[in-house]
């Protein structure tokens, strides 16, 4: 009677809905593992689940007066992690056919993300051979019964959804010690919990996700700022997006790829959202690619119109781009400010009140953005991402990292770079965090000062950029940082050590590719291992395909919700080439993406990048990694820049060429360094060439196309 009344009350107050695979709850041995969002969670499960479960409750809580009062309504057993008999009792209950509920986090979330997963729940599942039924509770965190006060906008009666996910099992891990078996079972359960979160993510477009964040975190919460130092709230950014979107649609057609040549600024974010809401597909153009690279990108995407800014072209000294590229129409945003009519202003005002009506009909699977590869190995390719793939990567990041609305991001990587776009713009916007957009990562003195001045807690960049920030920053500039993430290139040991020694901060290395929106793997405080790029993100499948001549690791192929829709190539303008990959048996499988990277995994699932397939030299029949060559050079001269490439060799097939900024570096030093590292003599180049500065791409990576061309030109050798 009491439970019936509570069910009616909770359904009325919170529009509570139970959905999903309810049949799995009726199996004989069932362990239900919900996430923990509020003090309501236990009551919600007790009154809405179609079975009567036994709740495992920590003994410190079960002894409280309110739990004793609920004893007649709810079955629960005290759980003491320090006493093995508690676990044995739960295993026995499951064996008797009683459904058991354990909250694996052990506490209510204070971040909105998953908290630490205790190993005990996973070990109970493995020991009892139970059917594990993941269950997601969504919405309860916004009630006054949650613990996110000051983090999210509280609501008295939010909608609460209980989703039962497909059942799975946790086999008993094979390990010699019970402690290791317990830990591995806990890691397996953690993976199940992360996959459950990914499974219930909403099906939205970018604009819909932005509006949902605006509702969730507050219409007037500051969310974005640039070098004008005028923060915009979600409503302020919405207003600008409506204005820019209204203008952009005059010069383009629905579904058209629209070029954006703009810096890291609030207006760029507004242009992305504005174009997206009106059914246009923003194509982020790399202004460092030069006339040749930009022409290739425009041709591949059949882009007819490019929106840019006179002020940006002036400050960046980029007028050679519109002057050298005449096949497209250039539209300058400054010229359009005064073109808004009274009708346009009324349209903007009306859609500020009813913003959902501003979006033209779209599906999450539709094209949302075009990003271009760096062109480090040839022509830039257009990478078309859907709303679904971009937002899936944002959700994957939020699943493993505990970003909250209290965080402040420093985003200096350009928005035409996938890392800068997803991690530097979409992730903070969808998380309720505040982001500061800065137009250049190369200002090594200014960026640290802004991190200090704006109280930033999250910084990301390439190893090169982070190393230079550390050189010029004051030790107190980074005092508030809690996440420093390196990606886009291998994190150098001296950069890692400098940050730890000078600032006491551990850099978390990650790995990504533009085609995966871009983050594939990342170290996080909950799961980190030096000299790896972390574990593959939840929701993704991975496999290694063997490569002849390479013994350790294999070619990494990926499949998941964050994979691109396809390529746009300059050879076939406008034609979308869907991803597919050779499975190693000569069969092309659609949906898989071949990264071209040689990767290995350790026993804990941590990923180590060995190098790109194209960055291996075949010398006298032996495969030599060019990254090993660069590692040898860095070990011999760690304060200079080095890049290795190849040139044809009539006798041995290919020969190594090392470009360096160290005028004193000799082959004898490289030989000594190779012996220290245990590297083969075959990896020591004979051709060493001095450059005052390595040619770099806009992302900070070496320009290997230019270096390869330089290597094939005859030049005096230094041995």
From Swiss-Prot:
Reaction(s) catalysed (UniProt annotation): a 2-acyl-sn-glycero-3-phosphoethanolamine + a fatty acyl-[ACP] = a 1,2-diacyl-sn-glycero-3-phosphoethanolamine + holo-[ACP]; a long-chain fatty acid + holo-[ACP] + ATP = a long-chain fatty acyl-[ACP] + AMP + diphosphate
Keyword vocabulary terms for this entry: Acyltransferase, ATP-binding, Cell inner membrane, Cell membrane, Ligase, Membrane, Multifunctional enzyme, Nucleotide-binding, Transferase, Transmembrane, Transmembrane helix
SUPFAM superfamilies noted in UniProt: Acetyl-CoA synthetase-like, Glycerol-3-phosphate (1)-acyltransferase
Region (Acyltransferase): 15-138
Localization, UniProt: Cell inner membrane
Topology of this chain in the membrane: Multi-pass membrane protein
GO CC aspect terms: plasma membrane
EC number: 2.3.1.40, 6.2.1.20
Transmembrane segments: 258-277, 409-433
One of the record's GO molecular function terms: ATP binding
PANTHER family (UniProt xref): LONG-CHAIN-FATTY-ACID--COA LIGASE, NONRIBOSOMAL PEPTIDE SYNTHASE PES1 (EUROFUNG)-RELATED
Matching HAMAP family: Aas (MF_01162)
Function as written in the Swiss-Prot or TrEMBL entry: Plays a role in lysophospholipid acylation. Transfers fatty acids to the 1-position via an enzyme-bound acyl-ACP intermediate in the presence of ATP and magnesium. Its physiological function is to regenerate phosphatidylethanolamine from 2-acyl-glycero-3-phosphoethanolamine (2-acyl-GPE) formed by transacylation reactions or degradation by phospholipase A1.
Name used for this protein in its record: Bifunctional protein Aas
Encoding gene (name): aas
């Amino acid at each position: 009677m009491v439970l019936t009344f509570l069910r009616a009350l909770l359904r009325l107050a919170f529009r509570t809905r139970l959905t999903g695979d309810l049949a799995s709850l009726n199996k004989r041995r069932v362990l239900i593992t919900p996430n923990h969002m509020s003090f309501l969670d236990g009551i919600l499960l007790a009154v809405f689940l179609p079975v009567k479960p036994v709740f495992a409750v920590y003994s410190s809580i079960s002894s409280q007066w309110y739990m004793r009062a609920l004893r007649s309504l709810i079955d629960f057993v005290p759980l003491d992690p320090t006493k093995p008999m508690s676990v044995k009792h739960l295993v026995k209950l499951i064996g008797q056919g009683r459904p058991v509920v354990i909250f694996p986090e052990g506490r209510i979330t204070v971040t909105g993300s998953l908290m630490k997963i205790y190993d005990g729940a996973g070990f109970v599942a493995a020991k009892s051979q139970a059917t594990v039924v993941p269950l997601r509770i969504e919405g309860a965190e916004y009630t006054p019964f949650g613990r996110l006060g000051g983090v999210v906008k509280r609501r008295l009666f939010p909608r609460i959804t209980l989703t039962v996910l497909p059942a799975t099992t946790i086999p008993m891990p094979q390990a010699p010690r019970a402690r290791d078996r317990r830990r591995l079972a806990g890691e397996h359960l953690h993976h199940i919990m992360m996959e459950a979160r990914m499974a219930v993510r909403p099906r939205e477009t970018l604009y819909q996700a932005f509006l949902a964040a605006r509702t969730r975190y507050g219409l007037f919460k500051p969310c974005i700022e640039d070098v004008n130092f005028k923060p915009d709230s979600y409503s302020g950014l919405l207003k600008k997006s409506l204005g820019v979107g209204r203008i952009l649609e005059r010069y383009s057609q629905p579904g058209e790829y629209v070029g954006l040549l703009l810096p890291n600024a609030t207006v760029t974010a507004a242009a992305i959202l504005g174009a997206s809401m009106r059914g246009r597909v923003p194509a982020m153009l790399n202004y460092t690619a030069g006339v040749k690279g930009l022409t290739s990108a425009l041709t591949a995407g059949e882009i007819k119109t490019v929106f840019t800014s006179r002020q940006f072209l002036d400050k960046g000294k980029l007028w050679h781009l519109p002057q050298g590229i005449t096949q497209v129409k250039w539209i300058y945003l400054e010229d359009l400010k005064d073109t808004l009519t009274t009708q346009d202003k009324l349209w903007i005002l009306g859609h500020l009140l009813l913003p959902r009506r501003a979006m033209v009909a779209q599906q999450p699977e539709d094209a949302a953005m075009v990003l271009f590869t760096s062109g480090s190995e040839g022509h830039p390719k257009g990478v078309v991402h859907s709303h679904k793939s971009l937002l899936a990567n944002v959700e994957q990041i939020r699943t493993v990292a505990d970003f909250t609305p209290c965080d402040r991001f420093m985003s200096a990587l350009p928005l035409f770079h996938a890392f800068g776009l997803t991690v530097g713009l979409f992730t903070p916007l969808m998380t309720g965090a505040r982001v500061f957009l800065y137009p250049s990562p190369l200002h090594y003195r200014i960026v640290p000062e802004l991190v200090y001045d704006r109280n930033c807690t999250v910084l990301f960049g390439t190893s090169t950029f982070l190393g230079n920030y550390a050189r010029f920053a004051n030790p107190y500039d980074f005092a508030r940082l809690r996440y420093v993430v390196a990606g886009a290139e291998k994190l150098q040991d001296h950069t890692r050590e400098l940050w730890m020694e000078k600032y006491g901060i551990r850099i978390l290395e990650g790995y990504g590719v533009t085609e995966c929106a871009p983050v594939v793997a990342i170290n996080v405080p909950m799961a980190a291992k030096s000299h790896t790029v972390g574990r593959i993100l939840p929701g993704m499948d991975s496999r290694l395909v063997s490569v002849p001549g390479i013994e350790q690791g294999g070619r990494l192929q990926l499949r998941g919700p964050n994979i691109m829709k396809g390529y746009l190539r300059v050879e076939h303008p406008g034609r979308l080439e869907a991803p597919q990959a050779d499975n190693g048996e000569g069969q092309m499988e659609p949906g898989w993406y071949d990264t071209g990277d040689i990767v290995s995994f350790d026993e804990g699932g941590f990923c180590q990048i060995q190098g790109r397939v194209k960055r291996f030299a075949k010398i006298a029949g032996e495969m030599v990694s060019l990254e090993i060559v660069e590692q040898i050079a860095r070990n011999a001269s760690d304060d200079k820049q080095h890049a290795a490439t190849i040139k044809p060799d009539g006798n041995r097939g290919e020969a190594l060429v090392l470009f360096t900024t160290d005028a004193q570096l000799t082959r004898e030093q490289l030989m000594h360094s190779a012996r220290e590292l245990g590297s083969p003599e075959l990896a020591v180049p004979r051709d060493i060439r001095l450059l005052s500065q390595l040619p770099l791409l806009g992302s900070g990576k070496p320009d290997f196309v230019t270096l390869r061309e330089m290597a094939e030109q005859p030049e005096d050798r230094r041995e």
